[in-house]
Amino acid sequence: MKNIYHSDIYKFQEPVKSYWEDTTKENFNLSKLTKDISSEVVVIGGGYTGLLCAINLIENYNLDVILLEAGKVGWGASSRNGGFCSFPPIKISYKKLQKIYGKDETKKFFKNSVEGSNYTKDIISNYNIDCDVTGDCNFILAHHPNKFQQIKEQAEVYKNEFGIEANIYSKEEFDKIGHTGTEQFGALSYKPGF
């Protein structure tokens, strides 16, 4: 095995296009680094994290910043996501988080997740980013009748322990506002998110 990732990830000269790249036009030009240059800070990587790091260093610290990207800006994971802004960004439950890290650290984690979601919305607004923000919350569906009680409990924890705005919808209520399929048995909505 030569590489641990699919060979497409190493094709910087001919990156595989994502849905987002195929449905929008590029509105900036990139130049190759062909000579020695200097700056106070060099940020390596032009994904979301690298771009926001560069912006913050320039705007908040007035630093001279150069951003280097081996491929195209936004190429990789940043342009290959579902486009949702939701939290928490993990698959394990809040109960398991509390068991592993304790209640205080879990509260901090959720607080940071809420702040991150709000920060993302602020970035979109402050820079007039045309990204078709839709909605103001996220939903967790009960995919089986016995899961409805779990999401009801989760809503109470979100509200009472983490201070997160959360609402519960019965199957019939959720039918009226969003999803009439037979595979849902109620839902939890929480804010912020989009």
Predicted regions and their residues:
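Extreme N-terminal leader/targeting segments of oxidoreductases
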Residues: 1-41, 59-63
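Flavin (FAD/FMN) cofactor-binding and adjacent substrate-gating region
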Residues: 2-16, 22-23, 91-98, 122, ...
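Short glycine-biased active-site loop of nucleotidyltransferases that positions the nucleotide triphosphate
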Residues: 34, 74-78, 177-180
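Glycine-rich Rossmann-fold phosphate-binding loop(s) that bind the pyrophosphate
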Residues: 45-49, 70
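Short amphipathic alpha-helical face segments that pack within enzyme cores
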Residues: 52-56
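Glycine-rich FAD pyrophosphate-binding loop
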Residues: 58-80
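Glycine-rich active-site loop/strand segments that organize a redox cofactor
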Residues: 80-112
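A non-catalytic, amphipathic alpha-helix used as a structural packing/dimerization or gating element
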Residues: 108-122, 153
